[in-house]
């Protein structure tokens, strides 16, 4: 009966989402304008609102509300504004109508960050070309699995590369387990992070090994993204902090993937990485399970850089006795990738952690920093760099 009720709920949600999509398509059809339009080194935004008094564009490259672009209205009620193209990158923006923030109905490219929805704008060129659709795309599955660790059915996204054939047992794939940050969920890396496009392009170019990427929900009390309307659950985890309580990855997810997909079933074929909260989780998961993972990526970790954001200085030795005094116990990774944005106040803590690892003779340590703060434009580049290092 419980299973039937869950299926009924899922069908109802699909129906409501389908209806919303039809309404959005109808709205965009009625709008009859092109927005955004990237042309001749400029970007033009348009929005139909004959009765509006004030319309503007709030964009990520302008600091959102700090510097909005005011739009002007023509005789047909179409508001517009043109602005010089920002540097190549994947950006987000919203339309603000009489103080109300909303989506641009002419742009079907929509991203969600927690409970906030934004339109996406890709300015091509340089590394941003990795974020464009590839001519050899892979696939993303939304997979429900049972977590015995948390006694709940949960959802994860699973990326498989172009050419993947579940029935071909002769090809085994390495797996990257990729974790989101605080406020995110299993959808974050595939939308905001452009994981699928990055992997598609790098694999097609021969810069990354064909691999699977598993993107779970790193919030132990959530069944799935809260957009599905499924309530959270009170749980008791094996570990105490928000950073190291994600024990379900090794207990539930790795066994599920290795039972249901043709993957490499040894530590050389496994990697774990994450951003911010997910970076802290990746650190605990990897160093607690050195026999399971040979590669770890820690992007802008609030755990390791905690002293800069009001927390106590991070002491890895406290969590993993012997990490600095007896490093041979943990010095077994092929790649320990550490990265942070240059304007992120976590960078000093990350740099300090990197130096301690080097001083203690840890092998495979790679450090990279990019212009940017605690934001996706940094983490997308981290992911791109990391997947080119692993499974060699």
Annotate each predicted stretch with a short phrase.
Residues 1-8:
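Bacterial N-terminal signal peptides that target proteins for export
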Residues 22-24, 35-68, 72-392:
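Non-catalytic cap/lid and distal C-terminal segments of serine-dependent acyl enzymes
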Residues 27-30:
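Short, solvent-exposed loop/edge segments of extracellular or virion-exposed proteins
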Residues 8-18:
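Bacterial N-terminal signal peptides
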């Amino acid at each position: 009966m419980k299973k039937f009720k869950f299926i009924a709920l899922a069908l109802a949600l699909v129906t409501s989402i389908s209806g919303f999509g039809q309404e959005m398509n109808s709205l965009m059809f009625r709008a009859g304008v092109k927005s955004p339009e990237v042309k001749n080194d400029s970007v033009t935004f348009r929005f139909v609102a004959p009765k509006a008094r004030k319309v503007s564009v709030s964009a990520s490259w302008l600091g959102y509300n700090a510097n909005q672009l005011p739009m002007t209205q023509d005789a047909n009620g179409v508001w517009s504004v043109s602005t010089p193209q920002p540097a190549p990158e994947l950006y987000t923006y919203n339309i603000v109508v009489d103080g109300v923030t909303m989506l641009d109905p002419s742009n079907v490219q929509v991203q969600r960050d927690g409970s906030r929805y934004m339109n996406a704008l890709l300015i091509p060129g340089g590394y941003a070309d990795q974020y464009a659709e590839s001519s050899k795309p892979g696939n993303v599955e939304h997979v429900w699995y049972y977590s015995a660790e948390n006694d709940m059915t949960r959802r994860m996204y699973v990326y498989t590369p172009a050419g993947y054939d579940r029935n071909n047992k002769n090809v085994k794939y390495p797996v990257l387990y990729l974790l989101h940050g605080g406020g995110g969920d299993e959808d974050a890396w595939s939308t905001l992070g452009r994981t699928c496009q990055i992997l598609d392009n790098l694999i097609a170019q021969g810069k990354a090994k064909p691999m699977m990427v598993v993107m779970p929900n790193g919030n132990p009390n959530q069944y799935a993204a809260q957009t599905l309307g499924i309530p959270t659950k009170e749980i008791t985890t094996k570990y105490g902090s928000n950073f190291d309580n994600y024990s379900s990855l090794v207990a539930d997810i790795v066994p599920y993937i290795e039972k249901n997909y043709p993957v490499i079933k040894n530590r050389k074929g496994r990697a774990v990485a994450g951003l911010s909260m997910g970076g802290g989780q990746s650190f605990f998961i990897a160093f607690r399970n050195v026999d399971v993972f040979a590669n770890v990526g820690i992007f802008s970790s609030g755990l390791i850089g905690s002293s800069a954001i009001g927390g106590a200085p991070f002491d890895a030795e406290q969590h993993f006795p012997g990490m600095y005094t007896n490093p041979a116990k943990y010095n077994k990774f092929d790649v320990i990738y550490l990265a942070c944005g240059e304007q992120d106040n976590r960078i000093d803590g990350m740099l300090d952690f990197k130096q301690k690892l080097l001083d203690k003779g840890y092998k495979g340590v790679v450090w990279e920093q990019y212009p940017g703060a605690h934001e996706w434009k940094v983490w997308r580049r981290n992911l791109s760099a990391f997947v080119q290092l692993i499974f060699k």
